[in-house]
């Protein structure tokens, strides 16, 4: 399928969750003394990001509070992703439980696109995983008052 359509129309799709606060991994102290720090013990609502990657383009990032489910993925595809795709694109998804294969294939075919699913437990085959790792790293070193949406906007072409 990839040989027929070419790699320029391959679009990798994934989602990632972001905790509200990020603890520091390192600190400074006098030699031989422990570093003490505080970290919130209560849980706050996490944010989720759904996005796609085509080549070097970061497509249709959607940031929202809560966790990703089937309804979020379908809504995101219909309202954001399809507007940014080239005709006859191939969407590549992982095997998350909420990626209902038959539903996704039907929605994609209605818009003239195709779906492929990665083998289970193969994040190394999905290049957008590197984007999520980079975003989390940038967030970790950003000033605490920096909104996650601002980090994503700087990283790609994020629009609310």
Q: What annotation goes with each model-predicted range?
A:
Residues 1-160:
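Short functional hotspots at interaction and active-site rims
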């Amino acid at each position: 399928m990839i040989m027929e359509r070419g790699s320029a129309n391959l679009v990798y799709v994934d989602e990632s969750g972001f905790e509200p606060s990020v603890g520091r991994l390192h600190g400074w102290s006098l030699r031989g003394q422990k570093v003490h720090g505080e970290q919130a013990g209560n849980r706050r609502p996490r944010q989720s990001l759904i996005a796609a990657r085509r080549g070097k383009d970061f497509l249709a990032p959607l940031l929202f509070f809560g966790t990703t489910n089937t309804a979020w993925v379908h809504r995101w595809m219909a309202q954001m992703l399809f507007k940014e795709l080239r005709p006859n694109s191939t969407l590549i998804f992982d095997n998350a439980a909420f990626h209902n294969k038959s539903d996704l294939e039907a929605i994609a075919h209605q818009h003239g696109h195709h779906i492929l699913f990665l083998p289970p437990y193969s994040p190394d085959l999905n290049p957008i995983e590197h984007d999520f790792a980079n975003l989390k790293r940038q967030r970790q070193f950003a000033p605490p008052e920096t909104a996650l949406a601002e980090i994503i906007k700087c990283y790609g072409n994020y629009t609310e």
